[in-house]
A protein has these predicted regions:
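Short, charged/polar N-terminal "headpieces" of proteins
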Residues: 2-41
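Short linear sequence elements within intrinsically disordered, low-complexity coil regions
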Residues: 7, 55-56, 113, 117
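Generic ordered-secondary-structure signal
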Residues: 23-25, 63, 76, 104, ...
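Active-site- and interface-proximal helix/loop "cap" or "latch" segments in soluble metabolic
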Residues: 26-93
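C-terminal charged interaction modules
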Residues: 86-122
Length: 122
């Protein structure tokens, strides 16, 4: 009888946030132990969520730097919703709801971009 042994692999993600005196993020840098990138990556915003199974709630850390522009924030949320639909599909095998999420994200970004044009007079 052959018994297959698995070795565990530890992976880590490090996030460094530089805050101003008012505790507003000036810069966000991150790196991951399994990443091919040699240097820490710069980011202007981050949304990190953990599932608390006891309370059945999401614990979140949402941060963005002072130089994150409103148009970038809209694009960031569009990308998050769009890519979360892929994650949802893989995790639940519910392609129909994942497609609804994608459809919502596409409508969201169209409305956001239209609002930006109206607000900025472009």
């Amino acid at each position: 009888m052959y018994i297959k042994h698995f070795t565990m692999h530890k992976s880590s993600i490090n996030i460094d946030i530089l805050l101003d005196p008012d505790k507003v993020p000036e810069s966000i840098h991150w790196n991951a132990s399994d990443s091919s990138a040699e240097m820490a990556q710069k980011a202007k915003a981050m949304c990190l969520a953990f599932w608390d199974p006891a309370d059945k709630t999401a614990m979140r850390i949402d941060l963005w730097t002072k130089d994150m522009m409103v148009d970038e924030m809209g694009e960031f949320f569009y990308q998050m919703i769009f890519t979360m639909s892929d994650t949802f599909a893989r995790a639940t095998k519910n392609a129909a709801l994942a497609a609804e999420m994608k459809s919502f994200s596409e409508g969201f970004i169209k409305k956001f971009r239209a609002a930006q044009i109206t607000e900025n007079g472009v």
